[in-house]
Swiss-Prot record:
One GO CC term on file: perinuclear theca
Position of sequence motif PPxY motif: 186-189
Composition skew (Low complexity), residue ranges: 251-272
Domain GRAM: 45-87
SUPFAM superfamilies: PH domain-like
PANTHER family xrefs: POSTACROSOMAL SHEATH WW DOMAIN-BINDING PROTEIN, WW DOMAIN BINDING PROTEIN 2, ISOFORM E
Sequence ranges of Polar residues compositional bias: 298-309
Native source species: Homo sapiens (Human)
Annotated GO biological process: egg activation; male pronucleus assembly; meiotic cell cycle; positive regulation of DNA-templated transcription
Protein name (record): Postacrosomal sheath WW domain-binding protein
């Protein structure tokens, strides 16, 4: 912890080291030290001011309207212990903890601090502070979209509670030189070339340097015209089927009497088919009835003589 080393000369700003992000700002905070080192009056009494939370530390800036020997008070995360958040019933919430003196910090020993948030927001501030301390301990400090990348290094942020409004935003003053990682961008990231200026209003036409499309992107070639006649209506041969596929001829009429529905695949024998000889056994009745008269006359005479005997 350091005393009177984190404020500007006019006591209206906080000095934030280069590479750190401002995570939160809480005005109207009261700082006191219930237990402190003896031999110094800088910790006596209650101080009112603005509290800043960065990626690595907490900075308290005493209000410039208050005459107090403590103008600023800086507490790094690694020197704070025993942090608690208290919620009294009839008073404002506050954060309490123990802080160790930093080397060359303007004092020695340790002290117990108490931060009372008169405007509320103590719980949110404590939660974000614990999160930032954990991230800093892992080597990945929290960042915000409000980070400033500049050729300078130390940022000064106004600390008065009622000075930062939408009509009058907080002023930023920069001092020092940045580390190597925050230097000027490489040549490839300079100003954009002339062809990448603002877009024309209404997109009237392409900027200078954009020629018309080549001919091959224009109308399609001749081979891609209307389809040939062969792709139109089908020819006459693809029309209705011929008459031969209509009703069957007269010879395919109903079967004679006594002929039942033949099983599938057992149609009647074709014309000129001869019956099997008598030695093959008797034919079924329906098959004999289905034979034509000329087939009956061709039976051998021996079968006739057996019938008459």
């Amino acid at each position: 912890m350091a005393v009177n080393q984190s404020h500007t000369e006019n006591r209206r700003g906080a000095l934030i080291p280069n590479g750190e992000s401002l995570l939160k700002r809480s005005p109207n905070v009261e700082l006191s030290f219930p237990q402190r080192s003896e031999g110094s009056n800088v910790f006596s009494g209650r101080k009112t001011g603005t509290l800043f939370l960065t990626s690595y530390r907490v900075i308290f800036i005493t209000s410039c309207s208050i005459s107090d020997p403590m103008l600023s008070f800086m507490m790094p995360f690694d020197l704070m212990t025993n942090l608690t958040v208290e919620q009294p019933v009839f008073a404002a919430n506050f954060i309490k903890g123990t802080i160790q003196a930093a080397p060359y910090g303007g004092w020695e020993g340790q002290a117990t601090f108490k931060l009372v948030f008169r405007n509320g927001d103590a719980i949110e501030f404590a939660q974000l502070m614990v999160k930032a301390a954990s991230a800093a301990a892992r080597g990945f400090p929290l960042r915000t979209l409000n980070d400033w990348f500049s050729s300078m290094g130390i940022y000064v942020i106004t600390g008065e509670g009622n000075m930062c409004t939408p009509q009058m935003p907080c002023s930023v003053i920069v001092y020092g030189a940045p580390p190597a990682g925050y230097g000027a961008p490489p040549p490839g990231y300079g100003a954009p070339p002339a062809g990448y200026g603002a877009q024309p209003v209404g997109n009237e036409g392409p900027p200078v340097g954009y020629r018309a499309s080549p001919v091959r992107y224009g109308a399609p070639p001749l081979g891609y015209g209307a389809p040939p006649a062969g792709y139109g209506a089908p020819p006459l041969g693809y029309g209705a089927p011929p008459l031969g596929y209509g009703t069957p001829p007269l010879g395919y009429g109903a079967p004679p009497l006594g002929y039942g529905a033949p099983p599938a695949g057992n149609e009647g024998p074709p014309a000129g088919y001869r019956a099997s000889p008598a030695g093959s056994g008797a034919r079924p009745q329906e098959s004999t009835a289905a034979q034509a008269p000329e087939n009956e006359a061709s039976l051998p005479s021996a079968s006739s003589s057996q019938v008459h005997s």
